[in-house]
């Protein structure tokens, strides 16, 4: 951190801008106050919620001026890290009951930098992932083309809804589905 803040002025400027964007949400006093535990509102015991089979809802929207995305990403990573610790400490060597991380609007709300590694390694530990993105391009823009392809490769079930206009992606999905032969039967009655 010292090097990033005291090095080349271009690097320092980039570092400061990145930090400001990540912490912009906390520049709003009411939001900052909600993130501080108090006697009336104690901190959530994440391990206890997971052990009881509870549910976490992280709700937010993308705002270019005060995005909740960095906070939601950090919190989602913390929840998943806690689940991993619990899975490794479990007498069964996995979470029982399992945990489903349902990541809707993944690129906008909580683009987890560790998602590919987690998908590859943590399914066997009782931590499953279901993620959704509006478009392939949105996923590639946030994660990069190679990382998005790696996520795509680790995905067991692919659901594509209508409305996609990405010709290349649609062709790729069509190629994955393969050729389908459909038998048709027709009858003629001999009349015109």
How would you describe each model-predicted region?
Residues 1-127:
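P-loop NTPase motor domains
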Residues 86-93, 131-134, 184-191:
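A generic structural motif
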Residues 122-142:
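Sensor-1/coupling segment of RecA-like P-loop NTPase cores
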Residues 58-59, 102, 132-134, 160-162:
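Conserved beta-strand segments of the P-loop GTPase G domain that flank and frequently precede/overlap
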Residues 45, 53-54, 117-120, 138-192:
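P-loop NTPase motor core of the ASCE superfamily
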């Amino acid at each position: 951190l010292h090097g990033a803040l005291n090095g080349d002025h271009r690097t320092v400027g980039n570092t400061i801008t990145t930090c400001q964007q990540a912490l912009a949400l906390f520049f709003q006093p009411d939001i900052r106050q909600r993130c501080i535990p108090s006697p009336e509102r104690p901190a959530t015991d994440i391990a206890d919620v997971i052990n009881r089979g509870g549910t976490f809802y992280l709700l937010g929207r993308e705002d270019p001026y005060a995005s909740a995305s960095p906070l939601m990403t950090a919190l989602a990573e913390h929840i998943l890290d806690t689940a991993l610790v619990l899975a490794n400490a479990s007498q069964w060597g996995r979470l029982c009951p399992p945990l489903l991380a349902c990541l809707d609007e993944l690129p906008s709300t909580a683009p987890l930098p560790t998602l590919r590694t987690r998908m590859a390694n943590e399914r066997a530990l009782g931590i499953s992932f279901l993620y959704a993105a509006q478009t392939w391009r949105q996923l590639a823009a946030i994660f990069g083309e190679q990382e998005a392809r790696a996520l795509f490769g680790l995905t067991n079930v692919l659901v594509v809804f209508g409305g996609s206009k990405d010709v290349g992606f649609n062709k790729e999905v069509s190629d994955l589905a393969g050729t389908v032969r459909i038998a048709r039967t027709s009858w003629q009655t001999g009349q015109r």
